[in-house]
Amino acid sequence: MGNVAKTLTCYLEAAEGMSEDEFITTYAYSVLVEKSAIVSLEHSSLLSGTKLLNDTRDVLHPITDSSELISNKVKVFELRKRSSSLVKDIFVGRAPTNDIVLANPSVSKSHLRFISIPRTKHYQLVDMFSSNGTYLNGKKINPFEKHQVEDHDELSFGIEYQLIYYSPQAFYEMLIGLKS
């Protein structure tokens, strides 16, 4: 099973009593924070279970209200390997064998992977020929091409499910900004 997601509220409460250095030491991993969630679960592929995004009845529910961000609904996924894995890349998808499991029907079983850039704290992402595609800041990326991710980049799994990428420093700054 992949890493267990925590809620944004959990991190917000932790950040309240910490300096930036303490937070970054305690939470040393980059994160993916949910931006939107799927509302309609109809029209899934019978073979893979992936929700196919070719129907105008599909509804996107963007999380835009800060009160909704602070609720227990928003999930945060740490960008890290499962302890039992030997491969360095971080795999993301719907299947329980991934390092990060996104239980959303618009996400493919093996949707994308993150590659750590040697001697840096940066990552590249690669779409693994997903059914609905991967979008980086609204632009669809081609399967198997590497794309570097930066703080505040929006990753879309198809067009329905978005996550925002944060380094530990940027995540702390975002949390402190939510408190003010």
Task: Locate the predicted segments by residue.
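Short coil-to-beta-strand transition motifs
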Residues: 104-109
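Short, well-ordered strand-loop elements centered on a beta-strand within folded domains, enriched
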Residues: 30-31, 120-128
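Intrinsically disordered, low-complexity acidic Ser/Thr-rich regulatory segments
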Residues: 1-103, 168-180
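Short, well-ordered turn and helix-capping elements at secondary-structure junctions
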Residues: 96-98, 111, 140, 145
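C-terminal boundary/linker segments immediately following FHA domains
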Residues: 122, 135-180
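Short hydrophobic/aromatic patches on the structural cores and recognition surfaces of FHA
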Residues: 92, 111-115, 124-126, 130-135, ...
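General beta-strand recognition
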Residues: 91, 101, 122-124, 156
